[in-house]
Amino acid sequence: MVEVRVPATSANIGPGFDCLGVAVNMYNKFFVEEIEEGLIFEGCADKFKNENNLIYVAMKKCFDKIGYKPTGLRIKIESDIPVSRGLGSSAACVVGGIVSANELAGGALNKKELLDLAVEVEGHPDNVNPAFCGGMTASISDNREVIYSKVKVSEGIKFCALIPDFTLSTEKARAVLPKSIDYKDGIFNVGRTALMISALNNGDFHLIKYACKDKLHQDYRAKLIENFYSIKKQCEKLNSLGVFLSGAGPTIMVMLREEDKDFSKNIKSFLETLKNKWEVRELKIDKLGTVVNNCKV
């Protein structure tokens, strides 16, 4: 049996639309073994127990590339990453599927080939890269090749995810974005993306609140998330370092100083006054990324 653990990811980090992403310590685990025949799923809803399951789709893509044909598969899922909340649940399934398939087939593909294949299936390198490699990454796709670099994050920072009880599909969140942007808005984001990376690198945490600003996606998507601005304002009042939409949303991610012990209980009290229910979850950066049989890929 192959055991694969994949972390949740938070993409964009404010201005770094479709390029920045960070892995956090919330995980999906996949236990996969080859059986004599059939396709058996455990740990997921009945509607996902078929060949359209994203984990199986990713596995088949890997098997086809290698030229391996399993006799049958048993796939058990232990999921801690909420679906359609902007925390990289799709990327976790794709990476978990591809890596487990490669292990079953004898490890025919190297790390670079696995990464390129995962991005081909999932489509978002800003989620796939940190899920695969851990830490924070800056990623691009160049002629179908995935290029990325690790972003050094100074010690002393943690994250807090505010996770609502409602979902928001990536497709719906993409549909509200404009077809084109003003030149000045592009410049606005380029500058703040550079500032974000530099501030995290150098421990200039007081600059993060400026770096979190963005003109490419967050304001458009905020309209789909009830109370987004009131929550953001309250987070700022509680001395957060920065607040941004996690991926396409609806989860709101907050950056905090490591020593901040009061934020979670205080924001929880505020969120309890709102109509929707929100889970408050403090998180740390996952530095390992995908782990196979307790070993880093």
Swiss-Prot record:
This is Homoserine kinase. Keywords: Amino-acid biosynthesis, ATP-binding, Cytoplasm, Kinase, Nucleotide-binding, Threonine biosynthesis, Transferase. Its EC number is 2.7.1.39. InterPro entries: GHMP_kinase_C_dom, GHMP_kinase_C_sf, GHMP_kinase_N_dom, GHMP_knse_ATP-bd_CS, Homoserine_kinase, Ribosomal_Su5_D2-typ_SF, Ribsml_uS5_D2-typ_fold_subgr. ATP binds at residues 82-92. Transmembrane segments: none annotated. GO terms for cellular component: cytoplasm. The lineage of its organism: Bacteria, Bacillati, Bacillota, Clostridia, Eubacteriales. The keyword Transferase applies. It catalyses: L-homoserine + ATP = O-phospho-L-homoserine + ADP + H(+). HAMAP family: Homoser_kinase. Belongs to the GHMP kinase family. Homoserine kinase subfamily. GO terms for biological process: threonine biosynthetic process. It comes from Clostridium botulinum (strain Hall / ATCC 3502 / NCTC 13319 / Type A). Catalyzes the ATP-dependent phosphorylation of L-homoserine to L-homoserine phosphate. It comes from the Bacteria. It is found in: Cytoplasm.
